[in-house]
Amino acid sequence: MPTKPYHVNVHELPRQSRFGGLMEETAVVMDGALLKFSWAKPADLGMTGRTAAAGKPDVHPFDQVIFLVSGRVEVTLGEGDDAETFTLEPGHLIYIPADMPHIGRVLGDEPAFGVDVFAPAREDYFDMAEHQLALERAAT
């Protein structure tokens, strides 16, 4: 895990594009957690994590918090009759327990920007934090 301080402007970090350019992401790793920064454009398609097909709920063994900075996002937790849908606006957060199916989509015409926290750190997302991890390796 990183041992060096890391100061950056997240809007200037390299981003990975998903869903045909509808979403861009980058990440920063901490000891025990990963912060993912997401920029998403409005679309009818439900956006989810890497492990699920587009439009299908994501399920993973990590606790997750989504904090919405700008835009409006609809998040559905659970599936079928047990599903519950929430609307997030700037300043809202939602906690998603590990192994809970979830999917989200941007509402309205305005893009959304949010911060996701995954604990423990999602190693399958470390490639999004390569900008940080490369500096860490170079310092040792």
Give the label of every model feature segment.
Residues 80-98:
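Short acidic-glycine-tyrosine-enriched beta hairpin
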Residues 75-76, 96, 101-108:
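Short beta-strand His + acidic residue motifs that chelate non-heme Fe in jelly-roll/DSBH
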Residues 1-39, 44-49, 55-56, 132-140:
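A short, N-terminal "cap"/entry segment at the start of jelly-roll beta-barrel domains
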Residues 40, 59-75, 117:
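Short, conserved beta-strand element in jelly-roll/cupin
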Residues 103-140:
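Double-stranded beta-helix
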Residues 34, 65, 72-74, 101, ...:
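Structural motif
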